[in-house]
Amino acid sequence: CEGAHITTIERAPHMYDYAVSNIKSLGLESRINLKFGDANDVLDSLIKDDSQDSRFDLIFIDAAKSHYREFFDRAEKLSKPGATIICDNMLIHGYLTGSTVDPGRRHRTSVKRMKEFLEYLKGRKDLTISLLSCGDGLAVIKLND
């Protein structure tokens, strides 16, 4: 999109360096703001920066699945009115599709917390939510004005 600007967060040093290299090679330094660090810390610093430059039309969350509610709460604070928040991997390897398969110890907490997050979203009358089954699931959440 002409005139669009992207702010993205990377916590892995090697991926950050790789992203910097790609952004430079594509000449997109003026349009992509790459931040290094833990997403919680970076988001909290953006929330404290109360300028319009730190408010977004679209936010994409792809983070620790058991903490999506916390990331969503931060994303909502950073959103412009009417913004869209997209959450990736909402079906957690298919465990949230109603299957009776036990997710096992490794995924049990993530599955429980993701179910709680989905219930929270469904209870919010000020949101329009679409859950898409593509890939590992996407939630497209529109903040109603």
Question: Residue ranges of each PLM-predicted region?
Answer:
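S-adenosylmethionine/decaboxylated-SAM
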Residues: 1-145
